[in-house]
């Protein structure tokens, strides 16, 4: 799983003073989705995670300055925080996955996730990857020949397979 925070925006509200919303990009199993969270949600997550796993430091809560440079530093800090939680923990708590709106993640530890493969095989070579698919609208082998001339190569191969004892023409 990869997590990035590519951007943030300032929201103004009639009921309360403005706040910053961070856009989180989550890449998992070849799929990408976005989640938007306020700093207060990050802080609440951090408090809960501290009780069950090793957590890195979270950027300071008290930033009264809405200067874009300060908010950019907070964005980078929160991105580093999320990435560190992923790197430092073999199993991610459901609480963390729910925060990122991740619905399914194998619960096996990384070391046991490929139990049927040879243990000497590297983790990189055992990962599945998505490959493009070539799609034919019609079966190219069933279509009529483009010309009236016989296909000499195909006839020769078929003749060799089915009539090996006969001499070619």
Curated annotation (Swiss-Prot):
Residue span(s) of domain PX: 1-125
Pfam family, one: PX
Membrane topology: Peripheral membrane protein
Alphabetical keyword list: Acetylation, Cytoplasmic vesicle, Lipid-binding, Membrane, Phosphoprotein, Protein transport, Transport
Keyword Hydrolase: no
GO BP terms, alphabetized: protein transport
Modified residues (Phosphoserine): 113, 116
Annotated residues for binding of a 1,2-diacyl-sn-glycero-3-phospho-(1D-myo-inositol-3-phosphate): 38, 40, 61, 74
Chief subcellular location: membrane
Database matches in InterPro entries: PX_dom (IPR001683), PX_dom_sf (IPR036871), Sorting_nexin_PX-domain (IPR052467)
Annotated localization: Cytoplasmic vesicle membrane
Cellular component GO terms held in the UniProt record: cytoplasmic vesicle membrane
MF GO annotations: phosphatidylinositol phosphate binding; phosphatidylinositol-3-phosphate binding; phosphatidylinositol-4-phosphate binding; phosphatidylinositol-5-phosphate binding
N-acetylmethionine modifications at: 1
Function per UniProt: May be involved in several stages of intracellular trafficking.
Family: Belongs to the sorting nexin family.
Identification of the protein by name: Sorting nexin-24
Lineage, highest ranks first: Eukaryota, Metazoa, Chordata, Craniata, Vertebrata
């Amino acid at each position: 799983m990869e997590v990035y925070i590519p951007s943030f925006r300032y929201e103004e509200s009639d009921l309360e003073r403005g706040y910053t919303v961070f856009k989180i990009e989550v890449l998992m199993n070849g799929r990408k989705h976005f989640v938007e969270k306020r700093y207060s949600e990050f802080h609440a997550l951090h408090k809960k995670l501290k009780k069950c796993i090793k957590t890195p430091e979270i950027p300071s809560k008290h930033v009264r300055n809405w200067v874009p440079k300060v908010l950019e530093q907070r964005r980078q800090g929160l991105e580093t925080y999320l990435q560190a939680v992923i790197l430092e923990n073999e199993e991610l708590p459901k609480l963390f996955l729910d925060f990122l709106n991740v619905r399914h993640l194998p619960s096996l530890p990384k070391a046991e996730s490929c139990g049927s493969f040879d243990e000497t095989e590297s983790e990189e070579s055992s990962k599945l990857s998505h490959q493009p698919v070539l799609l034919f609208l019609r079966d190219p082998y069933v279509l009529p020949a483009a010309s009236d001339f016989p296909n000499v190569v195909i006839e020769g191969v078929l003749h060799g397979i089915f009539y090996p004892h006969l001499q070619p023409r």
